[in-house]
Amino acid sequence: AIHCAALALMKLDNFQFQYIFKDKSDYDTYMENYQATYTEKADDIRAGGYRIYTTLDQDLQTALQSQLDNVLSPYTELQDNGKYALQGAGVIVDNMTNSVVAVVGGRGTEDVYNRAYLSARQPGSTIKPLIDYAPAFDTGEYYPARLVNDHKWENGPSNSGGSYYGNVSVREALNRSLNTVAWQILTDIGVDYGLNYLGEMEFQKLTYIDNGVPSLSIGGFTNGVRVVD
């Protein structure tokens, strides 16, 4: 709660959040400013005098926790500290208000480490609609019925199972989650063009090292992404 409240205070003070960085110098300068401002706001909250309101829906929160527990129930291996070896996280967002209405950061023992917004993992093919296809459609050059050629790329990715289908529609390429087509599309529209879409959606683990890297098309990021992103 303190973390989110500190960010809210930063927004109220017109702090300019940044998600895309030109280079290391740009990133370092921003992070120095961010950390100083964040620490100041978090300390203000801990000093008292604030009333914090959340958008969490307790019924949805309970349902999400139950669903996570049920899905992972077959995996019972425990670590030495008594926590489950296999963990998970989940978030529900109200798309009308963009508010987080439920957030689950794990299962089992009580844990202050909330994996839903603190832990980053590689998104794999789940990122394709966001960084490849949606930006490509917005260019007007790509549309669901357009044909693209699915073939093996030198120094590029292969498809799951090693199969290639030749000329396929963009719709079919997305349906089959073809890595080669996703790579081709992002390379064609420009990696940084697609990356900027994630910046506009406020993905918070992006780094300057990701700039121009075509493996982003199939979910290969430097830091990964968070569930809440």
What are these regions (language model features)?
Residues 141-195, 213:
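Conserved catalytic neighborhood of penicillin-recognizing serine enzymes
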Residues 190-206:
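Short, charged, amphipathic alpha-helices and their helix-cap/turn boundaries
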Residues 1-160, 171-172, 218-225:
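Extended, non-catalytic substrate-recognition/exosite surfaces adjacent to catalytic cores, especially
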Residues 205-229:
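Active-site-proximal helix/loop microenvironment
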Residues 130-133, 183, 195, 228:
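Predominant activation on well-ordered alpha-helical scaffold segments within soluble catalytic domains
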Residues 118, 178-179, 203:
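A broad detector of the eukaryotic-type serine/threonine protein kinase catalytic domain
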Residues 42-46, 174-177, 207-211:
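Short, flexible turn/loop "capping" segments at secondary-structure junctions
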